[in-house]
From Swiss-Prot:
It is an enzyme of class 3 (hydrolase). This is 5'-methylthioadenosine/S-adenosylhomocysteine nucleosidase. GO terms for biological process: L-methionine salvage from methylthioadenosine; L-methionine salvage from S-adenosylmethionine; nucleoside catabolic process. Substrate binds at G78, M153, M174, E175. InterPro entries: MTA_SAH_Nsdase (IPR010049), Nucleoside_phosphorylase_d (IPR000845), Nucleoside_phosphorylase_sf (IPR035994). The keyword Cell division does not apply. The gene is mtnN. GO terms for molecular function: adenosylhomocysteine nucleosidase activity; methylthioadenosine nucleosidase activity. Disulfide bonds: none annotated. It comes from Bacillus pumilus (strain SAFR-032). Pathway: Amino-acid biosynthesis; L-methionine biosynthesis via salvage pathway; S-methyl-5-thio-alpha-D-ribose 1-phosphate from S-methyl-5'-thioadenosine (hydrolase route): step 1/2.
């Protein structure tokens, strides 16, 4: 079993990297790939860089070069659903773009022409994440839609606009839809597991700086449990 894990920033990958045995590292086109072993499973850890272009380029390299069995995209996110708090974890049911608009040509808001409006996470991986989360009793774990855009969501007007477009949205961030889109094109199963570093629109820039490390700890904890339980 070959498992790929993608995080955008150093803070989002460093804990998992330290857990890998026999680790080797290489950089391709500015993307950092670390291969190693955790719980007798081969793991490819990708530090993709921030934003959709970086995520798409690095995920393409990952899938073409390493051909993993499945992909987990992890790291931090901004909470959107009213039930969520900083530190909570969101498991994706599906992933969408929140900054794509070709509705004038009768596409759904967020839909890239020629592709589905929503990239649906693999059911088995969602179940694996949910079952692994049962071992974590001090963090709320939710399941729902995650949306991606190339902007940090601290503008209340933008938050209100996205909330209107996606009323049941759980979290926002800057890479997952690009990762999911590439996985869709390659036919590779994926799931997104994100911990909340902030609540979108509510002094989110201050909260992000304060709670990024906590979010990374929580999301990595769940990812490690998922890898351990993978058959």
């Amino acid at each position: 079993m070959k498992i790929a894990v993608i995080g955008a920033m150093e803070e989002e990958v460093t804990i998992l990297r330290d857990q890998l045995k026999n680790a080797t590292q290489e950089n391709i086109a500015g993307c950092e790939f670390t291969t190693g072993v955790y719980e007798d499973k081969e793991v490819i850890l990708l530090k993709s860089g921030i934003g959709k272009v970086n995520a798409a380029v690095s995920t393409t390299l990952l899938l073409d070069r390493f051909q993993p069995d499945y992909v987990i995209n992890t790291g931090s996110a901004g909470g959107f659903h009213h039930t969520l708090n900083v530190g909570d974890i969101v498991i994706s049911t599906d992933v969408r773009h929140h900054d794509v608009d070709v509705t004038i040509f009768n596409y759904e808001y967020g839909q890239v022409p020629g592709l589905p409006a929503a990239f649906v996470a693999d059911e088995k991986l969602v179940k694996l994440a949910e079952e692994s989360a049962l071992e974590i009793d001090h963090i709320q774990v939710a399941k729902g839609t995650i949306a991606t855009g190339d902007s940090f969501m601290n503008d209340p007007n933008r938050v209100a606009f996205v909330r209107e477009k996606f009323p049941e949205l759980y979290a926002v961030e800057m890479e997952a839809a690009a990762v999911a889109q590439v996985c869709q094109l390659f036919g590779t199963p994926f799931v997104v597991v994100r911990a909340l570093s902030d609540i979108a629109g509510k002094e989110s820039n201050v909260s992000f700086d304060q709670f990024l490390e906590q979010a990374a700890i929580h999301s990595t904890d769940l990812v490690l449990r998922m890898i351990k339980q993978t058959q």
